[in-house]
UniProtKB/Swiss-Prot annotation:
Principal location: membrane
Organism placement in taxonomy: Bacteria, Pseudomonadati, Pseudomonadota, Gammaproteobacteria, Enterobacterales
Entry keyword Calcium: no
Family annotation (Pfam families): Proton_antipo_M (PF00361)
Purpose of the protein: NDH-1 shuttles electrons from NADH, via FMN and iron-sulfur (Fe-S) centers, to quinones in the respiratory chain. The immediate electron acceptor for the enzyme in this species is believed to be ubiquinone. Couples the redox reaction to proton translocation (for every two electrons transferred, four hydrogen ions are translocated across the cytoplasmic membrane), and thus conserves the redox energy in a proton gradient.
PANTHER family: NADH DEHYDROGENASE
InterPro entries per the UniProt record, alphabetical: NADH-Q_OxRdtase_suN/2, ND/Mrp_TM
E.C. designation(s): 7.1.1.-
Stated name of the protein: NADH-quinone oxidoreductase subunit N
Organism of provenance: Shigella boydii serotype 4 (strain Sb227)
Gene Ontology terms: cellular component: plasma membrane
GO molecular function: NADH dehydrogenase (ubiquinone) activity; NADH:ubiquinone reductase (non-electrogenic) activity; quinone binding
Length: 485
């Protein structure tokens, strides 16, 4: 297949991030300069974001059989780039106190972002697998970046071994699907899997194994066991990337697969997904109740949020509102998670050993960092789905599509899960306003709001509030991604 200039324009974000990887690699080889390499990474990610405007002008097109660039791909590419940009921004002050090599951190984040962009554009099971591996392999190193801390090293080893096992399930599942259908393209799968073929045992086994592999990457029950330990052990900026860019990119490609290939038409697969969604919502929220570590709490919380999103995915066959629900929910989840993990990153910067992730570290934060406490409160309220926040809009959409698809027991699970979640989110928020302990623990720098990370956190809080009151602009952007499918 010939690559035309139009194709190159469509691939601009991928090409720009790839070029940034090469430039940063050469810069590290030439001379180690933390500020220079951080700046190059941020410039590259910003340039990739700006290039989305030119991609939009080029229109929807297939670029090789592996990728399709359209409104859907642009939306998820934008979300991945925003998460990657925030990760680099939070990482800079954290790395200032880190005595080992700092520069490779940005290189690994950029390579993982490259995998996320590939997933957003994937239109083939081969590009899906390549994208997942490209996003996973750098994360093995990022999770263990604070390798002198036993907890970080343990988390990295655990994530590496379990991720390798999940990838083998995913790859074997793809092989079974190919053996039955004769093609790996999403569109071809949609054409070849009609007339009751989805009930073939070999095909069901293949999709079942793919669900195991993808369920691990998305931290869905019962493939979630790595999540709390890895979130806790990873440096705070890495937990930010794990919770946002990684999950958004993988969920986006799963959604595209469901749109083109009628996987959800199989009653057996729908039942399995419904059980996974129900278990993820209830178990994730129940396990978060007893947590006193904020990163572990947010890890269990992410399990329940992916369960909510799975409800919209199961309801996908009932209409376009499910696509809208996923887009709005993921945007709300992105900004809320960036704000929450951003506060943890600011409190943990510069690197001084373990992160400030104990709930005790945030007790009475309001009395000496009032704006930071207010930001954390807004994020907790949004994650809980309280009205006047973007999290509420996303959760309302999920409930609406659940009702529309008559998924009554899953709607009930969303309501019960949200009620349980309200308790532990408010527990974090209330602790911020209690009397500060006599011997205060870690604290954010006094001028945190003037740092790049502080600005990102403040913008995230502002977006959560503004889009929670007036979500029409976000809904319009999400709808623009839909007609180009």
């Amino acid at each position: 297949m010939t690559i035309t200039p139009q194709n190159l324009i469509a691939l601009l974000p991928l090409l720009i991030v790839g070029l940034t990887v090469v430039v940063v690699m050469l810069s590290i080889a030439w001379r180690r300069n933390h500020f220079l390499n951080a700046t190059l990474s941020v410039i590259g990610l910003n340039a990739a974001l700006v290039s989305l405007w030119f991609v939009g002008q080029a229109g929807a097109m297939d670029v090789t059989p592996l990728m399709r660039v359209d409104g859907f791909a642009m939306l998820y590419t934008g979300l991945v780039l925003l998460a990657s940009l925030a990760t680099c921004t939070f990482a800079y002050p954290w790395l200032e106190g880190y005595n080992d090599n700092k520069d490779e951190f940005y290189l690994l984040v950029l390579i993982a972002a490259l995998g996320g962009i590939l997933l957003a554009n994937a239109n083939h099971l081969a590009s899906l697998f390549l994208g997942i591996e490209l996003i996973s392999l750098p994360l093995f190193g990022l999770v263990g970046y604070a390798f002198r801390q036993k907890r970080s090293l343990e988390a990295s080893i655990k994530y590496t071994i379990l991720s390798a096992a999940a990838s083998s399930f995913l790859l074997f599942g793809m092989a079974l699907v190919y053996a039955q259908s004769g093609d790996l393209s999403f569109v071809a799968l949609g054409k070849n899997l009609g007339d009751g073929m989805l009930n073939e045992p070999l095909l069901l086994a293949g999709f079942g194994m793919m669900i195991v592999g993808l369920g691990f990457k998305l931290s869905l029950v019962p493939f979630h066991l790595w999540t709390p330990d890895v979130y806790q052990g990873a440096p705070a900026p890495v937990s930010t990337f794990l919770a946002t860019a990684s999950k958004i990119a993988i969920f986006g490609v799963v959604m595209r697969l469901f749109l083109y290939a009628p996987v959800g038409d199989s009653e057996a697969i729908r039942v399995v997904l419904a059980i996974i969604a129900f278990a993820s919502i209830i178990f994730g929220n129940l396990m978060a109740l007893s947590q006193t570590n904020i990163k572990r709490l947010l890890g269990y919380s992410s399990i329940s949020h992916l369960g909510y999103l799975l409800v919209a995915l199961i309801a996908l066959q009932t209409g376009e509102m499910s696509m809208e629900a996923v887009g709005v929910y993921l945007a709300g989840y992105l900004f809320s998670s960036l704000g929450a993990f951003g506060v943890v990153s600011l409190m943990s910067s510069p690197y001084r050993g373990p992160d400030a992730d104990s709930l005790f570290s945030y007790r009475g934060l309001f009395w000496h960092r009032p704006i930071l406490a207010a930001v954390m409160t807004v994020m907790m309220l949004s994650l809980a789905g309280i009205p006047m926040t973007l999290g509420f809009i996303g959760k309302f959409y999920v409930l609406a599509v659940g009702v529309q698809a008559h998924l009554w027991w899953l709607v009930g699970a969303v309501v019960v899960g949200s009620a349980i979640g309200l308790y532990y989110y408010l527990r974090v928020a209330v602790s911020l306003y209690l009397h500060a302990p006599e011997q205060p623990g870690r604290d954010a720098p006094s001028n945190w709001q003037y740092s790049a990370g502080g600005i990102v956190v403040l913008i995230s809080a502002l977006l959560v509030l503004v889009l929670g009151v007036w979500p029409q602009s976000l809904i319009s952007i999400v709808r623009l991604a839909m007609p180009l499918m």
